Amino acid sequence: DLAALDAKTSVLPEVQTNYKPGVKNGALTYLDGQAALDSILVPEGYKIEQWATEKEFPFLANPVQMSFDNKGRLWVATMPIYPNYRPGDARPDDKLLILEDTNNDGKADKQTVFADKLHLPMGFELAPEGVYVSQGTNLVLLKDLDGDDRADEQEIIFSGFDDHDTHH
C-alpha cells in the first residue's frame, strides 16, 4: 500500500529560492565589484584586485566558463538570463567574449564579442581550428575566418542532445 509507505517518510525542508514571481525572467542583481572584494577573506600576505566587472563590460553578466588563450586574453562564456530560460521563451542572446588588457595596467580594457546569439553555452574549448562550444542541443565549432576575433562560421559537430531541462 503506497499510502501507508508514504506516511512513513519525513517531510522535506522547504527550499529557498531566488525566483521572484511576477518578474519576467527574474532579476539580475550583483554585488558591486568592490563590495564583492570586500566580502572575501584574504590570508595575510595576499591581495586580490578587480580585473574586469559588469560595470565596465555589461556583457560580462553571469559568466559560466573562463579560459585564457596563448595571447593572455580571457575568454568568457556568458548566459545573462540563465537559469530563467524556459523552452518556448525567446532564445537568449548568450555570448562568448574575449577580454584583454591592451595597456598592461593589470585591468581589462578591451572587450570583443567573439560570438553572440548562442543558446546556453555551458562550456568551450579553444583549439587551433576554432572554438568548440557545447550549447543547447549541439556541440558546435566556431571559426574566425578573417582574423578579426569574431566567429564567421558555425559548424555543428554533434547534435541531438536534450535540453528540455537546462539545469543539466
Predicted regions and their residues:
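Beta-propeller domains with acidic blade repeats across secreted/periplasmic ectodomains
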Residues: 1-168
